[in-house]
Regions:
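Phosphopantetheine-dependent thiolation modules in NRPS/PKS and related acyl-activating systems
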Residues: 2-42, 49-51, 56-91
Length: 91
């Protein structure tokens, strides 16, 4: 799958995948700076499933040692942005 064209597109796709893992979450109320577990019921199995969804959705390998970077929307977007080169300004 192609990398998102912008940071906004990346965020929209991540929130869509998050909703698939945690369907009871209203993704419009997710606060980017707070860890998911502080905002809603999100346990270690959810983190694993979220990492798997991100892998499938973006085609990015996410080693288990990097799962801690997926614990908030802000850190997840930063991690994926580095992996995908998304949201970088053009020349």
């Amino acid at each position: 799958m192609a990398a998102p064209a912008s940071a906004a597109e990346l965020q929209a796709r991540v929130l869509e995948l998050l909703a698939g893992v945690a369907p009871d979450v209203d993704v419009h109320t997710v606060r980017p700076e707070l860890q998911f577990r502080e905002q809603f019921d999100f346990d270690s199995m959810d983190v694993f499933n979220f990492a798997a969804a991100l892998h499938t959705g973006f085609g990015v390998d996410i080693p288990e040692r990097d799962y801690r970077q997926l614990l908030s929307l802000e850190s997840c977007l930063a991690y994926l942005g580095k992996q995908l080169g998304a949201g970088k300004p053009g020349p």
